[in-house]
């Protein structure tokens, strides 16, 4: 009989020196302090080359959970696309070419959508610019850009600079125009807050929104009104740039979770999230990555198959698993943890705890749904039904993104209280080992030494604590978590898992 393990992922919990802006060290965390002092602890790299991203690139939840579940470094789509742009292979992508040629032959417009940022989490500015070059080279006459502003993975007022750069690029190619600009809060929702998506959709499809002649000035006016990039109200710069039936659309976001809802709204005949004032059903709609495996839309960069993930091994061995998170991170402990596979594994139970929808931002409810997630974990441990439990607490990341220090402190303390309850139950079960970690940093830097608010992830390492007294842990990277879990459970490690157990 194998041993049991419970993996607790504290999303956005990085390790950094104590500073006034470090909510992790400023918060009161008696339970984590005890666990980290009583049990072996190490630090894990969660960014850059160690998670399959470009050197120096901050990690993110999708990448982190993919690496954790796979037990190997999984090279990501961001560096792949960037490399193909450099080699010229990007410009030969047949899926992109088909959409471009459809627009050219039909005389219709080509629409390029994407998060306008160099944050590299959901998209990259460089990729959008390369697409504009490609459309120009292939002779498309009408190209319209619908851009979402970031403000989370990059500074909250960096958007005006990105829009200015896009405006300059459009002038350079000559056939492209900025059609709409909006904060990601609207068109890049992932929690089925359809009122938000509807506002974004109506700007892109119906030309409804704040009318402006100059995109940069519209963003700067938003700043003057106290509204930063993420929340910029949908702005219509070029009303004739609305998407119409028969047009071609290329969505340049490569991360699925915040690209799905707008894609559904634009493409599904039976879509019921909101009543569409205008249906467009584009002639060609290209997803840069796979946004939803149930969609039949063309994908420029199809997913690579990751075999023998930690979840696969549990199913293969006939072991029971329990995955739990609130809505904001549910896809991460299921789809991403399973290597981009939506299908539930044999013996894998899942629990989705709804994230609170009644507040527009999580600084207003920093506890989120953590207590309910904690209840489910404690119940699962107490039941002794499961061999592996995987849980995510979203607070330090989601509240960290708001940039509000007081709320981040409450978020960290909420997670600490939950870990106290989970550890108390786990310590009643000697055959179960608790493994505590994070997928990337965030709340460890809420503002810098100059007091400038930081809403982005960090490149700091993350903790790794294993409740095995007397053992020793080496430092490593996220890819080493699954092999360590297998070692704890006394199960063999498959050849595909190139990470290593950090237990010594």
Model-derived features with residue positions:
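Feature captures the catalytic ectodomains and active-site-proximal regions of enzymes
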Residues: 1-504
């Amino acid at each position: 009989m194998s041993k049991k393990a419970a993996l607790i992922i504290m999303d956005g919990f990085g390790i950094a020196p104590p500073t006034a802006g470090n909510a992790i060290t400023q918060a009161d965390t008696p339970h984590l302090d005890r666990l980290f002092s009583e049990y072996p602890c190490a630090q894990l790299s969660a960014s850059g080359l160690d998670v399959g991203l470009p050197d120096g690139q901050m990690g993110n939840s999708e990448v982190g959970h993919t690496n954790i579940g796979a037990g190997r470094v999984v090279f990501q789509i961001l560096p792949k696309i960037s490399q193909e742009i450099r080699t010229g292979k990007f410009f030969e992508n047949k899926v992109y070419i088909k959409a471009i040629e459809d627009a050219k032959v039909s005389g219709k417009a080509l629409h390029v959508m994407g998060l306008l940022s160099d944050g590299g989490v959901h998209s990259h500015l460089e990729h959008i610019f390369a697409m504009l070059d490609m459309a120009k080279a292939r002779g498309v006459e009408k190209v319209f850009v619908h851009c979402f502003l970031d403000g989370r993975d990059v500074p909250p007022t960096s958007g005006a600079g990105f829009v200015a750069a896009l405006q300059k690029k459009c002038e350079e190619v000559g056939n492209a125009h900025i059609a709409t600009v909006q904060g990601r809060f609207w068109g890049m929702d992932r929690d089925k807050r359809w009122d938000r998506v509807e506002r974004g959709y109506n700007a892109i499809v119906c030309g409804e929104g704040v009318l402006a002649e100059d995109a940069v000035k519209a963003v700067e006016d938003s700043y003057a009104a106290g509204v930063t990039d993420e929340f910029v109200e949908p702005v219509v710069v070029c009303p004739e740039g609305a998407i119409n039936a028969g047009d071609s659309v290329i969505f340049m976001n490569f991360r699925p979770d915040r690209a799905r809802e707008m894609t559904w709204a634009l493409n599904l005949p039976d879509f019921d999230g909101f009543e569409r004032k205008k249906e467009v059903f584009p002639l060609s709609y290209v997803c840069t990555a796979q946004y939803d495996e149930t969609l039949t839309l063309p994908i420029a960069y199809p997913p690579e198959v990751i075999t023998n993930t930690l979840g696969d091994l549990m199913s293969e061995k006939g072991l029971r698993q329990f995955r739990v998170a609130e809505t904001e991170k549910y896809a991460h402990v299921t789809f991403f943890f399973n290597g981009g596979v939506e299908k539930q594994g044999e013996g894998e139970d899942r629990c989705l705890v709804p994230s609170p929808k009644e507040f527009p931002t999580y600084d207003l409810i920093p506890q989120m749904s953590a207590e309910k997630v904690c209840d489910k974990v404690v119940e699962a441990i107490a039941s002794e039904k499961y061999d592996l439990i995987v849980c995510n607490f979203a607070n330090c990341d989601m509240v960290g993104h708001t940039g509000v220090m007081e709320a981040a402190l409450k978020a960290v303390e909420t997670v600490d209280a939950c870990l106290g309850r989970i550890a108390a139950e786990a310590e009643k079960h000697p055959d179960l080992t608790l493994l505590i970690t994070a997928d990337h940093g965030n709340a460890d830097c809420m503002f810098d030494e100059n007091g400038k608010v930081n809403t982005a992830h960090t490149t700091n390492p993350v903790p790794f604590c294993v409740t095995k007294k007397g053992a020793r842990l080496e430092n490593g990277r996220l890819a080493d978590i699954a092999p360590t879990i297998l070692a704890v459970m006394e199960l063999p490690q498959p050849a595909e898992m190139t990470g290593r157990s950090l237990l010594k």
